[in-house]
């Protein structure tokens, strides 16, 4: 029988293989030592390792370090979790099991409530399935076959009726199968370690009027070492939980009287305002104009912007659907742009807004400062011509790099390109994507491409931040928008006097101020960067109130507190150190007589020594590298 030979480009090689060869065959034949491969891409598309190669192609072997491959690994693990739940709870009806930012979950309709006491047996059942090394086999079934297979599962039936035309795929491992488009890892044995993390309730389709389900969260890894490292980080994260630190530093609290809306105490308000003032100073340098827009708009605005049709469930609607609290600033900025006539000379127009936003998050999803209903963003919208897009994006990237550099955060960039459903022409999209790619290239910022994941209104750059605990968090966003200017009929006059439609660049760097405060707290713990800390200096008073007052006046530019609680000197110093103060200044009789101050640097547990009061500011300036390696000492006066 005639064998068709194909060329497969892989890394720096071009392989000749027989038609029908699979990526797994190639892995075994040419890369036997690559034990870390869990998935693959064929011509840029994630595929099963068992997919037959039918034409010349480019093959990429993917590891757990790749975002897409990791999602595939966790999606496959969700199938194993579903299999275990069906084995343990015979009446269980599986609903939905996607990968998430950290692991995966499965929603299940089951009679018996699942609790933390069940985690161990669920893990044990999953390990049994993993050890059996079942292959993930893709099987095509007709719509009728699927409806018959899930006749007792109304939730799956809903998905079939809504999403399946004539046929769809299921993935089988052993006797278990689940409806899924894939792709998946090769077998359950690729999974080497599992941990059930938590469980909660969840509504079907996130609708409180529909069935209540049980949601089980878990995480898996392709090696036990990775799991050990993850659990160690989790323990560190517990100690650095921003809710715990926020309580200990008197920063903020939450109340049942306003779920999802934070009460910022004086210390927290200082930190909040310092972040905003830091950005305001940068806005002035970078040509942004800060504006204030209303918090509440009539629903006509949200109809015009398209948010009422596509975002209503996340909005707070009041007065019989007449008004709504704004969940984002862009429609208000469009109204502001439209209010005045603009020529090409006015562009780019960079509008920044710290307005309060509200989003109607489900109560079960609210989590400290990271998921709230009321928040503020460092939100900005740049109105520009198409020819200005690249330079404006470069400016956004430089701004982003500067701000994240201030906190020592690393980040990654991903260019998300034209999706299947999009507005505008292909040529318009191609030029916009090229402008974004060129901006990143010219900024010497490497990036990956996430094909087809752009918003329907324009391509975007997704920015993933790496915090001090190694977690990946998306805060910043840079998005091009062709649609909103058209919906609001925004115009400017070009050099020929012709009316043109501008492009909008949506841009946020910190994202939610609340969420960024949580990230900062969990990255630095109580020892915050000096410039942003609400507790910069503690003056330990040993019975010299007059001299303490003199010291306070000299250090008035800093945020300081006096510790005068009647305890011994060592206990007062200990109180100052454990309360997060960067500098501890001891003021006693000896210091008062010599007109000196004794300074202790908390971060390195180092005694700086005795200095004359008149020299203290110069000495602190000399210490600026250690005091705060992020910003020079003169930055600490941003917010007093």
Swiss-Prot record:
Plastid listed as a keyword: no
InterPro entries according to UniProt: aa-tRNA-synt_IIb, aa-tRNA-synth_II, aa-tRNA-synth_II/BPL/LPL, Anticodon-bd, Anticodon-bd_dom_sf, Beta-grasp_dom_sf, TGS, Thr-tRNA-ligase_IIa
Assigned keywords, A-Z: Aminoacyl-tRNA synthetase, ATP-binding, Cytoplasm, Ligase, Nucleotide-binding, Protein biosynthesis
Substrates-to-products reaction catalysed: tRNA(Thr) + L-threonine + ATP = L-threonyl-tRNA(Thr) + AMP + diphosphate + H(+)
MF terms (GO), sorted A to Z: ATP binding; threonine-tRNA ligase activity
Enzyme Commission number: 6.1.1.3
SUPFAM superfamilies to which the protein is assigned, alphabetical: Class II aaRS ABD-related (SSF52954), Class II aaRS and biotin synthetases (SSF55681), ThrRS/AlaRS common domain (SSF55186)
Name listed for the protein in its UniProt record: Probable threonine--tRNA ligase, cytoplasmic
Organism, scientific name: Encephalitozoon cuniculi (strain GB-M1) (Microsporidian parasite)
